């Protein structure tokens, strides 16, 4: 076990540097390394260097994962961690990336569980090999059973319920919930939470890997469903595409969202979007890597076997201005 300098470690834990570290959207199975020399802050701990793999279901071009990665890289910088980041939206290929991390004998694995059935066997292999596993972002209901010692993220069902209650309060009767990745348990839970409060909710599946297709599918749905009174995107880039379709079709439908980026924050300020629920992805990346480090240097298990919630937090016109600066820095 790595030697732990308690005084320096405690100081490091007390300060979370808000850095906008450079990152690009990752997908397609590409693995990229970042470590203690990334970013501009000085190294904060003197513990032995460890290697942590973060493997997400990121699709190429989805900027949500840039924010997750920035949080992870900030924690890696602080904790003297070599971070190996990779992602693939297809469950089988994501499982292959986890297997590669096991073969590399990494010191810890952070993994998203959007497709838990595809990942359950390989996550068990990691745990059986003595590699601590933290799950993040998706699959909170399956996390513990699959062997992760904690999970960082929001409850997608609770986030959906939050949106559903807000829509119900506004008198919405027939919202359209747009799922950009079929089979993603977290996205399905979001729509289920909305439907729990607004029974007239309708599901629309789109191909999130092709924004042109998203736009045309949404436009066609708006034109064929004139009684729909709200449409909900399940991620900031998709909601912004929905906004364009609404404007192009001349629809008066209300738009709501999940997640946040700088452009969506501005859209809320100018009332193109009513509100969003933010799951604070920077915290997901940061907390997950930090939890692995804490496990390695002190045997600490963050969360007590339970999920560590990072959301949902409602952002609407009343508070969008407060978060815009952070969103523009790529932190929210």
Give each language-model segment a name.
Residues 39-75, 79, 84-96, 104, ...:
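Extracytoplasmic "Venus flytrap"
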Residues 20-23:
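C-terminal motif of bacterial Sec signal peptides marking the signal peptidase cleavage site
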Residues 117-158, 259-269, 273-274, 324-325:
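Flexible loop/hinge segments that line or gate small-molecule binding clefts
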Residues 94, 150-175, 213-215, 261-264, ...:
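Hydrophobic alpha-helical segments within soluble ligand-binding/sensing domains
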């Amino acid at each position: 076990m790595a030697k732990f300098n308690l005084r320096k470690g405690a100081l490091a834990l007390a300060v979370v540097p808000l850095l906008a570290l450079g990152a690009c959207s990752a997908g397609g199975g590409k693995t990229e390394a970042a470590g203690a020399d990334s970013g501009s802050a000085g190294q904060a701990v003197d513990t032995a260097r460890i290697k942590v793999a973060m493997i997400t279901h990121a699709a190429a071009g989805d900027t949500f994962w840039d924010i997750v990665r920035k949080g992870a890289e900030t924690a890696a910088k602080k904790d003297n961690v070599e971070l190996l980041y990779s992602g693939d939206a297809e469950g089988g290929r994501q499982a292959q990336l986890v297997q590669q991390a096991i073969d590399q004998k990494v010191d810890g694995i952070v993994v998203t569980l959007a497709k838990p059935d595809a990942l359950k066997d390989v996550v068990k292999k990691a745990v059986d090999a003595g590699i601590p596993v933290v799950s993040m972002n998706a699959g909170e209901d399956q996390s513990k059973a699959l062997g992760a010692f904690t999970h960082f993220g929001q409850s997608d069902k609770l986030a959906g319920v939050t949106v559903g209650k807000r829509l119900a309060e506004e008198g919405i009767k027939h919202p359209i919930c747009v799922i950009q990745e079929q089979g993603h348990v977290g996205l399905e839970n979001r729509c289920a939470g909305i439907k729990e409060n607004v029974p007239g909710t309708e599901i629309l599946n789109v191909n999130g890997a092709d924004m042109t297709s998203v736009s045309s599918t949404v436009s066609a749905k708006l034109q064929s469903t004139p009684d729909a009174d709200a449409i909900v995107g399940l991620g900031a880039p998709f909601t912004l595409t929905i906004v364009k379709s609404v404007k192009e079709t001349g629809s008066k439908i209300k738009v709501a969202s999940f997640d946040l980026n700088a452009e969506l924050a501005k859209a809320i300020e100018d009332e193109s979007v009513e509100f969003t629920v933010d799951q604070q992805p920077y915290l997901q990346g940061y907390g997950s890597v930090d939890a692995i480090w804490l496990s390695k240097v002190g045997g600490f298990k963050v969360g007590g076997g339970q999920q560590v919630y990072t959301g949902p937090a409602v952002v609407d016109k009343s508070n969008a201005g407060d978060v815009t600066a952070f969103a523009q820095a790529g932190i929210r």
